[in-house]
Amino acid sequence: MMKLVLFSIIVILFSLIGSIHGADVPGNYPLDSSGNKYPCTVLGDNQSCIDVCKKHGVKYGYCYSFKCWCEFLEDKNVSI
């Protein structure tokens, strides 16, 4: 019984550590030709933001703080 409790505690700790470190995905706000961030109105998954991110060379993006955010968008690809 004691081994089961210890095993459960270890599993919980490792899952907490994984969720803390796994949540920070690098990315950037893409900019249009005028240097402005792309606005969006529907927070979270947003097809218009996904389309914008694809124009900038990455596969996925979403609406965050009413601006499109592209995951894994490098600084060199921010502007079109």
Swiss-Prot record:
Statement: the UniProt record of this protein carries the keyword Disulfide bond: yes
Tissues of expression: Expressed by the venom gland.
Gene3D superfamilies given in the database record: Knottin, scorpion toxin-like
Keyword RNA-binding attributed: no
Subcellular location: Secreted
GO cellular component, as recorded: extracellular region
Location of the LCN-type CS-alpha/beta domain: 25-80
Signal sequence coordinates: 1-22
Entry keyword set: Disulfide bond, Ion channel impairing toxin, Neurotoxin, Secreted, Signal, Toxin
Entry GO MF terms: sodium channel inhibitor activity; toxin activity
Matches recorded under InterPro entries: LCN-type_CS_alpha_beta_dom, Scorpion_toxin-like_sf, Scorpion_toxinL/defensin
SS bonds (residue pairs): 40-63, 49-68, 53-70
Domain comment (free text): Has the structural arrangement of an alpha-helix connected to antiparallel beta-sheets by disulfide bonds (CS-alpha/beta).
Role noted for this protein: Probable neurotoxin that inhibits ion channels. Is toxic to mice. Is about 2.8% of the total protein in the venom.
Protein family (similarity comment): Belongs to the long (3 C-C) scorpion toxin superfamily. Sodium/Potassium channel inhibitor family.
Name of this chain's protein: Toxin Acra1
